[in-house]
Amino acid sequence: MDLPEELLPLSWLLGQWVGVGTGQYPTIEDFRFGQELSFTCDGRPFIAMNSRSWILDDEGNRVRPSAMESAFFRPRPDNQFEALFAHPTGFTEVWYGRVTIADIQDARITRASLEMTTDSVMRTESAKEYIGGQRLYGLVSDGDLAWTFDMSAMGEPLSNHLAAKLQPA
């Protein structure tokens, strides 16, 4: 199936990714997590993302489920994108961002980044306070996917919460 032309700037995200990351925030203890992340396109002009993660012990074994999220990335003009994220913990987000292509070799994107900022957050009555965040996804020179998530939540200012480096599955 051909990828719609307007999604080509995000084509480097497509596929299955697995790896390990770290988490921290002023209101919790630091932790390590394992993650499975997939980006897919069924031919329509959006990319679907599904992520699930687990808390890991010191030996790298799964201790318990950690987080899940689903998202849809939709193109806008000039390498800009909007994304809709949903979380089972009771909130949804609208994100806006821009893709930067840093290197192309043999007609393939080999280094790129997607920077995004929340535009709005909607949460259920029972969800924890979460104001907004920033995300950065990057295809780094070794072909891995690195990403970070900074958030403002539970009365704390914007600060790093998650970072991971994932390899193609």
Predicted regions and their residues:
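Amphipathic/hydrophobic helical signal segments and adjacent flexible N-terminal regions
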Residues: 1-46, 54-65, 142, 150-169
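A generic structural signal for short beta-strands and their flanking turns/coil linkers
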Residues: 13, 33-35, 43-47, 67-71, ...
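Short hydrophobic/aromatic-rich beta-strand segments that constitute the beta-sheet cores
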Residues: 19, 48-51, 80-85, 114-118, ...
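Hydrophobic/aromatic beta-strand elements that line small-molecule binding cavities or substrate pockets
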Residues: 34-40, 69-74, 94-103, 132-139, ...
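Short, solvent-exposed aromatic-acidic interface loops
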Residues: 52-57, 86-92, 121-122, 150-155
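Helix-adjacent hinge/juxtasegments
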Residues: 58-101
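Acidic, glycine-rich flexible loop segments
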Residues: 90-91, 109-134
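Surface-exposed, gly/pro-biased binding rims or lids
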Residues: 123-153
